[in-house]
């Protein structure tokens, strides 16, 4: 038993002198492992008389428990010290300024669309939408566009087959609305449209918004007043507006709308090509054939329609000279519109 006491004292001294958890583990294996010194003492019980084995075995177990207890306590102190050091190293200084967050913003095209929609919904128009993949009838036939019209050319329109295509305007939404609703109808139709064209002022995909009003006793003066008021509100200034006679298959009479150049106030500049005027939209009274093909009696109801390119208005409002900037996803450009 003197050897046992000496072995325990030796083990406890080793535990206290250990400098880290790895050293403790080596001490545990040396004294308490399968081939450890205290374990080997337990194996000598077989050499003792039977009557002494219980007593000696109990003493050995007490010795092992004592060493284990001290070893675990020492290990816990190391772990606590390690945790304390780690927390100190990772301490967050709450007095430091936080990391700034960059706030997002609406895309200028989205801003422009919302501004247009807001004006028309405030004066009683609804928002109508339709498919971007359209059939030939709704994109052309129902709008009084004959088969020989240049717009049907493969050079201007993206066809899937002889009957299906990417819509070239949002006018098909007007046709579908007239087919499904009875007058009075007051709608604007925003959406993406597709034409085979690409340069600094054109894109193969762009946004268009068209308007339609169908009711009794509607005339060109109603159309003129609506457009003039829209341009005044959209650009937030009084602008001279003129209507030039034009031709569209789906309206009669038809007109192109020019407004006083917002860049030079009509004095003449590079943007307006020294004319003082900017073309902003097309419009006209809905052709009787279009009303008739949509199931509306042109003798009882009249209507007007107009259409404008959203990118065109955004370029004029924000002073952007290259349409492609809207689609380059350059944050340096887009950040200006927050």
From Swiss-Prot:
Residue sites binding Mg(2+) per the record: 252
GO CC term (a single one): cytoplasm
Catalysed conversion reaction: tRNA(Phe) + L-phenylalanine + ATP = L-phenylalanyl-tRNA(Phe) + AMP + diphosphate + H(+)
Cited InterPro entries: aa-tRNA-synth_II (IPR006195), aa-tRNA-synth_II/BPL/LPL (IPR045864), Phe-tRNA-synth_IIc_asu (IPR004529), Phe-tRNA_ligase_II_N (IPR004188), Phe_tRNA_ligase_alpha1_bac (IPR022911), Phenylalanyl-tRNA_Synthase (IPR002319), tRNA-bd_arm (IPR010978)
GO process annotations (BP): phenylalanyl-tRNA aminoacylation
Keywords: Aminoacyl-tRNA synthetase, ATP-binding, Cytoplasm, Ligase, Magnesium, Metal-binding, Nucleotide-binding, Protein biosynthesis
Keyword Nucleotide-binding: yes
Cofactor(s) demanded: Mg(2+)
EC number: 6.1.1.20
Subcellular location(s) per record: Cytoplasm
Pfam families noted in UniProt: Phe_tRNA-synt_N (PF02912), tRNA-synt_2d (PF01409)
Gene Ontology terms for molecular function: ATP binding; magnesium ion binding; phenylalanine-tRNA ligase activity; tRNA binding
Cofactor binding mode and count: Binds 2 magnesium ions per tetramer.
Gene3D superfamilies: Bira Bifunctional Protein, Domain 2 (3.30.930.10)
Source domain of life: Bacteria
Similarity comment: Belongs to the class-II aminoacyl-tRNA synthetase family. Phe-tRNA synthetase alpha subunit type 1 subfamily.
Subunit structure: Tetramer of two alpha and two beta subunits.
Protein name: Phenylalanine--tRNA ligase alpha subunit
Organism: Pseudomonas syringae pv. tomato (strain ATCC BAA-871 / DC3000)
């Amino acid at each position: 038993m003197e050897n046992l006491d000496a072995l325990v004292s030796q083990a406890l001294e080793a535990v206290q002198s250990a400098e880290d958890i790895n050293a403790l583990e080596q001490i545990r294996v040396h004294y308490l492992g399968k081939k450890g010194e205290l374990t080997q003492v337990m194996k000598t019980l077989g050499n003792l008389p039977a009557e002494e084995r219980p007593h000696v075995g109990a003493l050995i177990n007490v010795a092992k428990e004592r060493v284990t207890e001290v070893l675990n306590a020492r290990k816990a102190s190391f772990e606590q010290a390690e945790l304390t050091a780690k927390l100190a190293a990772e301490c967050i200084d709450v007095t430091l300024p936080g990391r700034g967050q960059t706030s997002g913003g609406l895309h200028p095209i989205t801003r422009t669309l919302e501004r247009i929609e807001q004006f028309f919904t405030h004066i009683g128009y609804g928002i109508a939408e339709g498919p971007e993949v359209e059939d030939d009838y709704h994109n052309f036939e129902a709008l009084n566009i004959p088969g020989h019209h240049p717009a049907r050319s493969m050079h201007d329109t993206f066809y899937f087959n002889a009957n299906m295509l990417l819509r070239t305007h949002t006018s098909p939404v007007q046709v579908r609305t007239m087919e499904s609703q009875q007058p009075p109808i007051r709608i604007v139709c925003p959406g993406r449209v597709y034409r085979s064209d690409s340069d600094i002022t054109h894109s193969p995909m762009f946004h268009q918004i068209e308007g339609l009003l169908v009711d009794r006793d509607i005339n060109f003066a109603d159309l003129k007043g609506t457009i003039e008021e829209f341009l005044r509100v959209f650009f937030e200034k009084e602008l001279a507006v003129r209507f030039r006679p034009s031709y569209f298959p789906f309206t009669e009479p038809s007109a192109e709308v020019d407004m006083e150049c917002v860049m030079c106030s009509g004095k003449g500049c590079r943007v307006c090509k020294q004319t003082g005027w900017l073309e902003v939209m097309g419009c006209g009274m809905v052709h009787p054939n279009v009303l008739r093909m949509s199931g509306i009696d042109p003798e009882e109801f009249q209507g007007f329609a107009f259409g404008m390119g959203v990118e065109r208005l955004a370029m004029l409002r924000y002073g952007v000279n290259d349409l492609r900037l809207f689609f380059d996803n350059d944050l340096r450009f887009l950040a200006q519109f927050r």
